[in-house]
């Protein structure tokens, strides 16, 4: 289960005691969760008014950054066009897997200096992730256009003889070219009707050249045949052919056009290969950047909410729980017993809908302790 609960509770005599009590109740004495300390440095508190306003802003920023993280991850999956395992290998944060990064979280002092105000740190994060979001849109648009154009050309060269491009199938020798009077048509003949074609094609219209039809290609259901006739008989031939379930394809042999199409396909295919490597590298780097930013926002939110709930001086322990999938309900009950004394309004019920003004939490997620969920299931495989 790649879901984490990031919680905090006030320090008892020491923060270490708070941690030991939680660890004993959730991990040591039973197997409800894997627990670890979550290290948040001594950030600048600022005024209460600023904290209340920041609480709302961080909630919005959290949702935005999570969205960008998921978009980058999903686009990585789209670009790799590969299995889930292959994608997961590329979704790293600071060079390690996401679970390792979260459980060993260390604040990045270089990126987010703690001498800055909380507001400034949140603005640095917002600016960086907005840039990633904008870059992703432009890079994805360019690559998708290229990929789409290539797929359109590939589709033309796939499918049945009734619909696919015939340029790759036919040769110059299959046609009578540069004749004022004669023209060669290409006809799709169902295999079941091929004997009828052999018997009838010379008489479907006047002025069909005898013995001018050959099988040029075939697919599962049909043959592609050529036939040469006088130009003025073409309309009559088309009509009679259709009545007999023979389909005349609209095709004119033009070497220059066919060469241009081939060159375009080669160019698009080469461009796609050239862009693939740098794009995957960009996605890996910026997934890492966005994910790191997201976890720092979680840390900021825990800090702000802990100060708002537990007061000053700052004295709380942030802790990370990775719930055992089968024990989620029991874990919630144990946490409730541990911390119900922190808030009498939440003491009577667990997971009950409550509307607590000023605290930016969804109704189902108000608990006596500070709580945020981190869900590492970032991909939606179709």
UniProtKB/Swiss-Prot annotation:
Q: Give the matching InterPro entries.
A: ATPase_V1-cplx_csu, Vac_ATP_synth_c_sf
Identify the keywords attached in UniProt to this record, alphabetized.
Acetylation, Cytoplasmic vesicle, Hydrogen ion transport, Ion transport, Membrane, Synapse, Transport
Q: Does the keyword Kinase apply?
A: no
Q: Does the keyword Repeat apply?
A: no
Please list the GO terms describing molecular function: proton-transporting ATPase activity, rotational mechanism
The record's tissue-specificity note reads: Ubiquitous. Abundant in brain, liver, kidney and testis.
For membrane topology, the record states: Peripheral membrane protein
Query: What SUPFAM superfamilies does its record include?
Result: Vacuolar ATP synthase subunit C
Identify residues that carry N-acetylthreonine: 2
Compartments, record wording: Cytoplasmic vesicle, Secretory vesicle, Synaptic vesicle membrane; Cytoplasmic vesicle, Clathrin-coated vesicle membrane
State a single Pfam family of this protein: V-ATPase_C
Instruction: List GO BP terms, alphabetically.
Output: synaptic vesicle lumen acidification
Q: List, alphabetically, the Gene3D superfamilies matched.
A: 3.30.70.100, subunit c (vma5p) of the yeast v-atpase, domain 2, Vacuolar atp synthase subunit c, domain 1
The free-text function statement in the UniProt record for this protein reads:
Subunit of the V1 complex of vacuolar(H+)-ATPase (V-ATPase), a multisubunit enzyme composed of a peripheral complex (V1) that hydrolyzes ATP and a membrane integral complex (V0) that translocates protons. V-ATPase is responsible for acidifying and maintaining the pH of intracellular compartments and in some cell types, is targeted to the plasma membrane, where it is responsible for acidifying the extracellular environment. Subunit C is necessary for the assembly of the catalytic sector of the enzyme and is likely to have a specific function in its catalytic activity.
Subunit organization: V-ATPase is a heteromultimeric enzyme made up of two complexes: the ATP-hydrolytic V1 complex and the proton translocation V0 complex. The V1 complex consists of three catalytic AB heterodimers that form a heterohexamer, three peripheral stalks each consisting of EG heterodimers, one central rotor including subunits D and F, and the regulatory subunits C and H. The proton translocation complex V0 consists of the proton transport subunit a, a ring of proteolipid subunits c9c'', rotary subunit d, subunits e and f, and the accessory subunits ATP6AP1/Ac45 and ATP6AP2/PRR.
Family stated for the protein in its record:
Belongs to the V-ATPase C subunit family.
Q: What's the protein name?
A: V-type proton ATPase subunit C 1
Species whose genome carries this gene: Mus musculus (Mouse)
Q: What is the lineage of its organism?
A: Eukaryota, Metazoa, Chordata, Craniata, Vertebrata
């Amino acid at each position: 289960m790649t879901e984490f609960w990031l919680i905090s509770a006030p320090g008892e005599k020491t923060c270490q005691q708070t941690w030991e009590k939680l660890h004993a109740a959730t991990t040591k004495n039973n197997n409800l969760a894997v627990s670890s300390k979550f290290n948040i440095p001594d950030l600048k508190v600022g005024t209460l008014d600023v904290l209340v306003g920041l609480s709302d802003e961080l909630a919005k920023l959290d949702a935005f950054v999570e969205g960008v993280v998921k978009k980058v991850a999903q686009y990585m999956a789209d670009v790799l066009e590969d299995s889930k395992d292959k994608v997961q290998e590329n979704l790293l944060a600071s060079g390690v897997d996401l679970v390792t990064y979260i459980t060993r979280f260390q604040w990045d002092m270089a990126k987010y200096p703690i001498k800055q105000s909380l507001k400034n740190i949140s603005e640095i994060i917002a600016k960086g992730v907005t840039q990633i979001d904008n870059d992703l849109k432009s890079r994805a648009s360019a690559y998708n256009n290229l990929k789409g154009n290539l797929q359109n050309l590939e589709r033309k060269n796939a499918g049945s003889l009734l619909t696919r491009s015939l340029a790759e199938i036919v040769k110059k020798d299959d046609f009578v070219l540069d004749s004022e009077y004669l023209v060669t048509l290409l006809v799709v003949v169902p295999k079941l009707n091929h004997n009828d074609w052999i018997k009838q094609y010379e008489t479907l219209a006047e002025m069909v050249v005898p013995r001018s039809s050959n099988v040029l290609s075939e697919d599962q259901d049909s043959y592609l045949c050529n036939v040469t006739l006088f130009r003025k008989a073409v309309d009559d031939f088309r009509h009679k052919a259709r009545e007999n379930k023979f389909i005349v394809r609209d095709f004119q042999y033009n070497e220059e056009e066919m060469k241009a199409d081939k060159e375009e396909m080669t160019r698009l295919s080469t461009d796609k290969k050239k862009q693939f490597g740098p794009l995957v590298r960009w996605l890996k780097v910026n997934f890492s950047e966005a994910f790191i930013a997201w976890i720092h926002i979680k840390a900021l939110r825990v800090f702000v909410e802990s100060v708002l709930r537990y007061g000053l001086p700052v004295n709380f322990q942030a802790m990370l729980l990775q719930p055992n999938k089968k024990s989620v309900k029991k874990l919630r009950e144990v946490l409730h017993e541990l911390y119900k004394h922190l808030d009498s309004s939440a003491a009577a019920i667990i997971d009950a809908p409550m509307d607590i003004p000023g605290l930016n939490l969804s109704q189902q997620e108000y608990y006596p302790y500070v709580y945020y969920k981190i869900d590492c299931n970032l991909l939606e495989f179709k």
